[in-house]
């Protein structure tokens, strides 16, 4: 029987100013959907997989074709509804409504398990959208580089006096998200040893310049790390192997990194994590023939992996969970101390979230890198005092290879996002940019996610699992006029552990776009300030008052 998710075709986004849809507001999601499946962007485009285990852009290739046809035919007062990667309806709305509304992999809480999802998935009734895979705003590994960089820099401030020179970071996973780690480490001044079981993933990161070297033995990798750290030269190496085997061996040998984390796809025990002692071929075959055996073996391996991370933590090495839910699996497997080391958000990132600062990203629909370089200069012009951001933009231009449509990410917050959006829109209007820009973000943002083992871990008021906030964020972005809005479940940490929302807005140079941009790019980060102010964070309360937010049940107005 033919697999409806397999096709050998090659998809790439159109470039230039000629459009095949009826307006840029529908051409934009069309191009970004196609960009998600560009072979230079997606991890497994022939299977519709963008990143993150089985994070897909569309449910089947037939659904992809129907989405494309629907977008090309969509009028300026119509909205396309997409249910778990399947286009299910077109309805008349109005010009300021989103052109696309997306809901991916959402399940009633009692049934929000991998077992139930996988059953639906096999029947063709669901699709795992991850975060930006099914919401069509993945920009390649760059999308997580700055967040990882900010985490490593802050860890360096807290633990090493502000410098990571001569230090090295041990991690696992070089997929679409984990692949950011070696480059982020090098940008932060550190060396990085990343363990990865898939040689194709290592080669992908080498090809896109996210990784410097590869090694096939621990001895070879450690020789590089020792040489680089001694010279104070920040470089990275990908070690072919299984993290669940390599990390315990490093503990036994007394090897001591300066920081430990992990970004294997542990959120998905069947499709994302290679069990100890298994070959890649055996793993791939048994995922189809005996998924329960794969899951059992993978979960046991994750426990061993986390035990090794705890050994590093106990020896005084800064150790952090990077949001793949590996601690939860280890705890479920009987490792009571699995949560002794913290997640990266409460340890290093939450103060940024309190001010609505998060992963603001944009892509040039023209396909011309010069459009991104012009926007880089505009960001510096509008934020002249943010030298840290200027340094990031300089490093990004020098080190980050574009994947698919040229794009940029930089972390900015409430009060700055809408200013940048309006400036980009004016650049489109004036012809300074060759074609419209789309602005979006990761679902990992200050007001758009409930994920008790990641973004909302250890909230001050204990509201870690309250998921009203991402629902309100999606509703507000819809009401504000985002070009497309998405609401997902299970991204990052897997089924049952997160709900989150995303938005994208198109800057097409029109007055209508300017009005929408001002609303969306103010309201979206403002919900993050609101959420953290409600949880009792003084930084967020101060930010809310400084920005004049009206929060009657929070500020006591």
UniProtKB/Swiss-Prot annotation:
Predominant localisation class: cytoplasm
GO annotation, cellular component aspect: cytoplasm
Active site per the UniProt annotation: 410
Protein residues bound to NAD(+): 52-53, 130, 176-178, 196, 242-243, 263-267, 273-274, 322, 492
Catalysis performed (reactions): 4-imidazolone-5-propanoate = trans-urocanate + H2O
Record-listed E.C. numbers: 4.2.1.49
Record GO biological process: L-histidine catabolic process to glutamate and formamide; L-histidine catabolic process to glutamate and formate
GO MF entry, a single one: urocanate hydratase activity
UniProt keyword list: Cytoplasm, Histidine metabolism, Lyase, NAD, Plasmid
Pathway per the UniProt entry: Amino-acid degradation; L-histidine degradation into L-glutamate; N-formimidoyl-L-glutamate from L-histidine: step 2/3
InterPro entries, alphabetized: Urocanase, Urocanase-like, Urocanase_C, Urocanase_central_sf, Urocanase_CS, Urocanase_N, Urocanase_Rossmann-like, Urocanase_sf
Cofactor list: NAD(+)
Location(s), subcellular: Cytoplasm
Bound cofactor: record note: Binds 1 NAD(+) per subunit.
Known function: Catalyzes the conversion of urocanate to 4-imidazolone-5-propionate.
Assigned protein family: Belongs to the urocanase family.
Protein name per its UniProtKB record: Urocanate hydratase
Organism: Rhizobium meliloti (strain 1021) (Ensifer meliloti)
């Amino acid at each position: 029987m033919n697999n409806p998710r397999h096709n050998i075709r090659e998809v790439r986004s159109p470039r230039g100013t000629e459009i095949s849809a009826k307006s840029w507001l529908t051409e934009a999601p069309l191009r970004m959907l196609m960009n998600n499946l560009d072979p230079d962007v997606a991890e497994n485009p022939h299977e519709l997989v963008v990143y993150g285990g089985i994070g897909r852009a569309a449910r089947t290739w037939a659904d992809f074709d129907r989405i494309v046809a629907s977008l090309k035919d969509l009028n300026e007062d119509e909205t396309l509804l997409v249910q778990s990667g399947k286009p299910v309806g077109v309805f008349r709305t109005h010009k300021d409504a989103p052109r696309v509304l997306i809901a991916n992999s959402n399940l009633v809480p009692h049934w929000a398990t991998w077992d139930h999802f996988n059953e639906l998935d096999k029947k063709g009734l669901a699709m795992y959208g991850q975060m930006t895979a099914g919401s069509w705003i993945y920009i390649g590994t760059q999308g997580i580089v700055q967040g990882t960089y900010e985490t490593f820099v802050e860890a360096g401030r807290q633990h090493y006096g502000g410098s990571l020179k001569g230090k090295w970071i041990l991690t696992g996973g070089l997929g679409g998200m984990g692949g950011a780690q070696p480059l982020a480490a090098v940008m932060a001044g550190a060396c990085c040893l990343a363990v990865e079981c898939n040689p194709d993933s290592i080669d992908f990161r080498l090809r896109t310049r996210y990784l410097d070297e590869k090694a096939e033995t621990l001895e070879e990798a450690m020789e590089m790390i020792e040489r680089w750290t001694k010279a104070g030269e920040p470089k990275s190496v990908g070690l072919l192997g299984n993290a669940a085997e390599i990390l315990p061996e490093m503990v036994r040998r007394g090897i001591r990194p300066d920081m430990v984390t992990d970004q294997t796809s542990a959120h998905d025990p069947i499709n994302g994590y290679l069990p100890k002692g298994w070959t890649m071929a055996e793993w791939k075959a048994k995922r189809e023939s005996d998924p329960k055996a794969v899951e059992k073996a993978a979960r046991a391996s994750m426990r061993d992996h986390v035990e090794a991370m705890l050994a590093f933590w106990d020896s005084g090495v800064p150790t952090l969970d990077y949001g793949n839910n590996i601690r939860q699996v280890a705890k479920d497997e009987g490792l009571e101390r699995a949560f002794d080391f913290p997640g990266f958000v409460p340890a290093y990132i939450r103060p940024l979230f309190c001010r609505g600062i998060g992963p603001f990203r944009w892509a040039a629909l023209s396909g011309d890198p010069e459009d991104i370089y012009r926007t880089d200069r505009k960001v510096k012009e509008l934020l002249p005092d943010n030298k840290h951001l200027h340094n990031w933009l300089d490093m990004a231009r020098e080190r980050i290879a574009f994947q698919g449509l040229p794009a940029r990410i930089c972390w900015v917050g409430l009060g700055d996002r809408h200013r940048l959006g309006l400036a980009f829109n004016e650049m489109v209007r004036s012809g300074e940019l060759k074609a419209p820009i789309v602005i979006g973000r990761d679902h990992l943002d200050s007001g758009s996610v409930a994920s008790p083992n990641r973004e909302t871990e250890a909230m001050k008021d204990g509201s870690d699992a309250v998921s009203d906030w991402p629902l309100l964020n999606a509703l507000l972005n819809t009401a504000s006029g985002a070009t497309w809005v998405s609401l997902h479940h299970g991204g990052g940490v897997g089924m049952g552990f997160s709900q989150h929302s995303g938005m994208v807005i198109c800057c097409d140079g029109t007055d209508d776009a300017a009005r929408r941009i001002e609303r969306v790019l103010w309201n979206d980060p403002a919900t993050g300030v609101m959420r953290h102010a409600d949880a009792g964070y003084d930084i967020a309360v101060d930010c809310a008052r400084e920005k004049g937010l009206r929060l009657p049940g929070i500020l006591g107005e």
